[in-house]
Structure formats: structure tokens, C-alpha cells
């Protein structure tokens, strides 16, 4: 009986294992006077509360620590500031250590780490240091490969020698030596002539040296008075270098003749008048034609194409507003297309080596006319028109290729002075000084030019004659010259 009485008490004092309802709690309160407490849920709740407080405290600590740090960047971007630790075996340890060091150190300091393996340093390319403190570089394998490719391309594109072809270098050396030899020979002859003029100078001359100084106009900057003599000295040396062959019709050409060349040039004179081109364009056009024919065989069907292409090139070089390619095609009645003209243009330019600046007869005629007009014995304007007319007559005649442009210009001035005034010798010390020729040096050319001047009936090519028969040129084409005596060349 005693055991039976103690069991209910023990059972009642024990903590219930299940959930306590309101009825059970009221019964226990009435029986024992208190409600039994549940210890296990309370301990669990306290543990959860303690754990929750621990986690929140850790987060608050990290947040406060990150707020106090001056660098707002995440840890990983700060670690990659030093690129030498990429791909290392101890990267995780190094990251933690480096982040702590960078937070404590100044922003301008850099933490260098030594990689644990040698392969790490080999894979990472060298990068320049960051320009701003606190910046970082993120490099992967693709960027490393691209950097290596760029370095290889840069090495491959490094310039080598300017002349890799030894043959090209030798040709240029030959041409340079030929040019220098021509210049040296000409300058030696010019110096000898100057010494001779100084020895034969007369005290009554205006300059005291036997000739009139035509370069004393220092007020006109376009005349280049201070170095005009040096300019024309170099031009006379340059005309010896790039000049056409005087026998290319006999030596090279088989399908064209001298007459075809004359017809082409006569037609080009009309074209230049139609488009109002300057005389320098016409002279350069014919120079390009003769230089090209001196090197290349051409068929007669392509001769007119060469003519308009040469005038196109000369127009681009001399004119302010050059005619278009379509206009040159139009004047040939569209015999040649634009593509054919452009193709021929490239062929001519490459054959000339793009050397278009050559002294022509017109170049020297300006200088020699200025020297001839210094005496003022003949009208200056008429003398200029007549000398230009005689010089242009030589463009059509193939036989005048054997004379230098300066010789033709000097001969035109000689014959023009003789045609307008027979009372005086047409050659004097001033012309001899500025042309570098004596009257005996140009005798053959002057005689050939006079025959060309009088040959009006047998020549069907009258474009130049009709041009200078106009009133604006004072009809100088109608003038003739008397016989040339031998005394004029002594």
C-alpha cells in the first residue's frame, strides 16, 4: 500500500515528456499548487538565443571593422593589386595575410609576395605599376596570351633596313654617282668661265664685271635676287640628268614615226589652248612623252592615250585647276575609257620614278629674256612673244631633241633679237654670262631654228603658227629674220 501511495507522487513530480494541455496544467495546479516547468525547451531556447547573439555580434564586428577601414573595395580586389601571387598554391593563406596587412598599412604602400612555385612567375606577364594608388589589375590566362601575341607582333613589325634589296641600292648609288659627277663637271666649267669673265671685264660696265646685273631687284621677293644665280646653275646641271634620248625613233620605236609624234604634239597645242593651260604644262607634257618613248615600245593605237595621259599628269603638276580625267576622255571622242587613262597614268609615273620636276626650255627662257631685256634696245613685250614662238616651234620637230633645253632657249633669244634689230650684235656679255654660252656654242641650233622659222609652206602642222598670228601676241609668227652672217658667231 505504501508503494502504491508513493508512485502517484513520483509520477506527478516527474516532468511530463509530452505537451501539457491547459486541462492538465489546471489539474496539476489544483493538486500540487503549482504548474511544473519544462526545462528542455527553455534550455533549447536559451541555446538558440545565445547562438543568435553570437552570430549577430560577429556580423556587427565585421561591419564596424569594414566601416572603420579607409579602402571601400572588397578583399579580393585589394589582394590582386600584386599580380605575383596569381596561381600560387598558398593563395588562400596569402590573401588573408595580405588583406590584414593592407588594412593596417598606408594606402600608398604595396605588399609584395613571393610565389611558392616558379611556374607562377613564368605564367604571369610583366605589367607596369599602377598609376594611381589603390587600383588593381585583374589578369587571366586569355589576357596573358594576348599580351604575348602583341609582343611577338611588335617584334615582327620592327623596321629593318630601308633598302633590303641590294639591287635597288646599287641602282640608286649609280644614279646618285652619275648625278654628282654631272654636277661637279658643270660647276668646274662654270667656275672656269667666271674666272675668264673676270679677266675680260671692262671698267665701263654697270657692274664692273663686264655684264649688267639683273639680280639687283632686292625689293621683289619673288625674284629670289640673293640666290637666283645658284638656282639656275643647279637647273643647268639637272638638265643633263633626265633628258630623253635623241634617237629613240630609230633605236626603239617601230610602229610610230616622227610625223606621228609631230601630229600628236600639234593636237596637244590645240588642247592646251582650248583649256587655257599655261605654257609650262605643254612643255612638261612633251617632256614626259619623249622620256616614256625613250624607254618603252608603243603601238600607234596607244600614242594618243600616252599624249592625253602625259597632259593629265602635267596639268596636275603645273595647273591650279587641272582638267578632269573625263574631259581628256571626251576630247578623244571617248576613244579611251577612264580606266585606261588611269592605268596609263600609273605606268608613266612609275616609269619616271615620280621625277616630274625637270627644267624645260620655258624654265630657262624666263631667265634669258630678263637678261636680253636689260639692254632695252628692242621692245620687251615683242621680244618675249617672238622668243616664246620660236621656242614652241621646236617642240614639234623631233630633230631638236639633240639640243639641251638651255641651248634651245638661248638660240630662241638670239634669233628673236636678230629678227627685231639688225643694227646691233644679238649676243653680248650679259647674255653670255647668264646663259653660260658663247655665240659660237649655239650657232648650229640658231641656224636650225631659223630654217624652222622660214619653213611655213612645207609644214602642215600650223597650230603654233596660228596661235602666234593672233593680235594678242602681236602677230610675231608673220615676222622673218634676215640671213645670219658668220661674223655674228665670232
Swiss-Prot record:
Polar residues biased stretches: 63-72
One GO MF term attached to the UniProt entry: cyclin-dependent protein serine/threonine kinase regulator activity
GO BP term, example: cell division
CDD domains (alphabetical): CYCLIN_AtCycA-like_rpt2, CYCLIN_AtCycA_like_rpt1
Intrachain disulfide bonds: none
Assigned keywords, A-Z: Cell cycle, Cell division, Cyclin
Cross-referenced InterPro entries: Cyclin (IPR039361), Cyclin-like_dom (IPR013763), Cyclin-like_sf (IPR036915), Cyclin_A/B-like (IPR046965), Cyclin_C-dom (IPR004367), Cyclin_N (IPR006671), Cyclins_cyclin-box (IPR048258)
The organism's place on the tree of life at top rank: Eukaryota
SUPFAM superfamilies referenced in this protein's UniProt entry, alphabetically: Cyclin-like
Pfam families per the UniProt record, alphabetical: Cyclin_C, Cyclin_N
Signal peptide positions (record): none
One cellular component term from this protein's GO annotations in UniProt: cyclin-dependent protein kinase holoenzyme complex
Residue runs in coiled coils: none
Gene3D superfamilies according to UniProt: Cyclin-like (1.10.472.10)
Region (Disordered): 34-76
Family (UniProt): Belongs to the cyclin family. Cyclin AB subfamily.
Protein name per the record: Cyclin-A2-1
Organism per entry: Oryza sativa subsp. japonica (Rice)
Chain's gene name: CYCA2-1
Amino acid at each position: 500500500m505504501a508503494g502504491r501511495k508513493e508512485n502517484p507522487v513520483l509520477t506527478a513530480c516527474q516532468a511530463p515528456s509530452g505537451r501539457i494541455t491547459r486541462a492538465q496544467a489546471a489539474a496539476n495546479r489544483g493538486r500540487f499548487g503549482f504548474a511544473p516547468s519544462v526545462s528542455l525547451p527553455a534550455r533549447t531556447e536559451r541555446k538558440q538565443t545565445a547562438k543568435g547573439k553570437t552570430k549577430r555580434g560577429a556580423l556587427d564586428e565585421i561591419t564596424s571593422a569594414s566601416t572603420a577601414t579607409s579602402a571601400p573595395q572588397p578583399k579580393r580586389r585589394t589582394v590582386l593589386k600584386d599580380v605575383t601571387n596569381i596561381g600560387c598554391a598558398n593563395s588562400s593563406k596569402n590573401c588573408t595575410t595580405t588583406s590584414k596587412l593592407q588594412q593596417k598599412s598606408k594606402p600608398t604602400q604595396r605588399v609584395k609576395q613571393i610565389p611558392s612555385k616558379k611556374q607562377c612567375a613564368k605564367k604571369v606577364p610583366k605589367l607596369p605599376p599602377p598609376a594611381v594608388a589603390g587600383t588593381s589589375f585583374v589578369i587571366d590566362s586569355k589576357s596573358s596570351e594576348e599580351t604575348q601575341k602583341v609582343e611577338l607582333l611588335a617584334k615582327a613589325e620592327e623596321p629593318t633596313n630601308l633598302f633590303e634589296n641590294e639591287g635597288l641600292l646599287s641602282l640608286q648609288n649609280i644614279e646618285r654617282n652619275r648625278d654628282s659627277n654631272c654636277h661637279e663637271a658643270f660647276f668646274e666649267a662654270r667656275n672656269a668661265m667666271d674666272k675668264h669673265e673676270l679677266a675680260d671685264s671692262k671698267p665701263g660696265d654697270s657692274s664692273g664685271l663686264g655684264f649688267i646685273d639683273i639680280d639687283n631687284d632686292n625689293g621683289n621677293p619673288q625674284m629670289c635676287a640673293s640666290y637666283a644665280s645658284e638656282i639656275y646653275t643647279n637647273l643647268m646641271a639637272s638638265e643633263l640628268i633626265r633628258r630623253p634620248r635623241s634617237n629613240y625613233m630609230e633605236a626603239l620605236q617601230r610602229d610610230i614615226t616622227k610625223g606621228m609624234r609631230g601630229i600628236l604634239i600639234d593636237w596637244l597645242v590645240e588642247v592646251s589652248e582650248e583649256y587655257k593651260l599655261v605654257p609650262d604644262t605643254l612643255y612638261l607634257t612633251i617632256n614626259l612623252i619623249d622620256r616614256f618613248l625613250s624607254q618603252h615600245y608603243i603601238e600607234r593605237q596607244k600614242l594618243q592615250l600616252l599624249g592625253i595621259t602625259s597632259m593629265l599628269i602635267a596639268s596636275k603638276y603645273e595647273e591650279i585647276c587641272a582638267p578632269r580625267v573625263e574631259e581628256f576622255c571626251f576630247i578623244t571622242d571617248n576613244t579611251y575609257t577612264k580606266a585606261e587613262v588611269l592605268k596609263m597614268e600609273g605606268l608613266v609615273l612609275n616609269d619616271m620614278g615620280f621625277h616630274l620636276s625637270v627644267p624645260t626650255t620655258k624654265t630657262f627662257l624666263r631667265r634669258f629674256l630678263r637678261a636680253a631685256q636689260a639692254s632695252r634696245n628692242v621692245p620687251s613685250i615683242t621680244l618675249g612673244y617672238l622668243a616664246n614662238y620660236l621656242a614652241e616651234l621646236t617642240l614639234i620637230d623631233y630633230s631638236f631633241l639633240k639640243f639641251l633645253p638651255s641651248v634651245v632657249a638661248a638660240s630662241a633669244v638670239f634669233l628673236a633679237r636678230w629678227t627685231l634689230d639688225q643694227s646691233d650684235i644679238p649676243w653680248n656679255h650679259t647674255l653670255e654670262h647668264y646663259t653660260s654660252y658663247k655665240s659660237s656654242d649655239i650657232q648650229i641650233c640658231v641656224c636650225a631654228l631659223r630654217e624652222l622659222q622660214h619653213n611655213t609652206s612645207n609644214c602642215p602642222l600650223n597650230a603654233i603658227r596660228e596661235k602666234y598670228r593672233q593680235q594678242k601676241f602681236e602677230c610675231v609668227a608673220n615676222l622673218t629674220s634676215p640671213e645670219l652672217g658668220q661674223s655674228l658667231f665670232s
